Amino acid sequence: MALLPFPLPFAELEVGHHLYWQIGDLYLHGQVFLSSWILIGILLVLVLAGTRNMQRDPLGLQNLLEFLWNFIRDIARDNIGEKYYRDWLPFIGTLFLFIFISNWGGALIPWKIIELPEGELGAPTADINTTVAMALLVSLAYFYAGLSRKGLRFFELYVEPTPIMLPFKIIEEFTKPLSLSFRLFGNILADELAVGVLVYLVPLLVPLPVMLLGLFTSAIQALIFATLTAFYIGEGLHEAH
């Protein structure tokens, strides 16, 4: 998500100064790389701590992890179906957990204490390159699911119920990743900017309601992304009616 052969035009949408590392002909977005791995590390620690001494009657962190597992399982099963959802549960669960912890980490972790030569750390999902990369992964998963299940018959859905739908179906394939990526990016970036401005202007209790609303919105965005991912995969797997 952070490794690019050249700086993408999407990077122009970012706000402020940014840190890039050049490795040969590749450009590595330093802020996204660092914040992503910090958050992945936190997630791994939480998972290992919650599954270290598992009990028959779950308590504490184990209970929370089992709740999340059941929640993600229900999303996958409802949208993909009983027959195929298990194959896609790790993919959908990984996306949901990464987006969720990225969104909340961007709001709760005091990133400013980590000083960088340029820019500052923040939520990886507030960077357009991250959200576009995840949206493209979802598109690839959709095509893989359809082609692996139906072969070339997968492309019949582009001319159903009538061939006149072909151009509209093609346009739809481009709008899916665009809507996924820009919805997540726009909401998280707007939340970070709003909180940042309020903290700068009124640094006491006024920003707190906005931060709480931002946490709620961040959780909803993770849910929307995971649900749409499962829906698209289910759409690719099932026969058109």
Swiss-Prot record:
UniProt keyword annotation of Transport present: yes
Record-linked PROSITE patterns: ATPASE_A
Main location: membrane
CDD domains, A to Z: ATP-synt_Fo_a_6
SUPFAM superfamilies: F1F0 ATP synthase subunit A
Protein name: ATP synthase subunit a
Recorded GO CC terms: plasma membrane-derived thylakoid membrane; proton-transporting ATP synthase complex
GO molecular function: proton-transporting ATP synthase activity, rotational mechanism
Source species taxonomy: Bacteria, Bacillati, Cyanobacteriota, Cyanophyceae, Synechococcales
Membrane protein topology class: Multi-pass membrane protein
The keyword Glycoprotein is assigned to this record: no
This protein's UniProt keywords: ATP synthesis, CF(0), Hydrogen ion transport, Ion transport, Membrane, Thylakoid, Transmembrane, Transmembrane helix, Transport
Entries under PANTHER family matching the protein: ATP SYNTHASE SUBUNIT A, CHLOROPLASTIC (PTHR42823:SF3)
Transmembrane parts of this sequence: 30-50, 89-109, 128-148, 193-213, 214-234
Subunit structure: F-type ATPases have 2 components, CF(1) - the catalytic core - and CF(0) - the membrane proton channel. CF(1) has five subunits: alpha(3), beta(3), gamma(1), delta(1), epsilon(1). CF(0) has four main subunits: a, b, b' and c.
InterPro entries for this protein: ATP_syn_F0_a_bact/chloroplast, ATP_synth_F0_asu, ATP_synth_F0_asu_AS, F0_ATP_A_sf
Record Pfam families: ATP-synt_A
Protein purpose: Key component of the proton channel; it plays a direct role in the translocation of protons across the membrane.
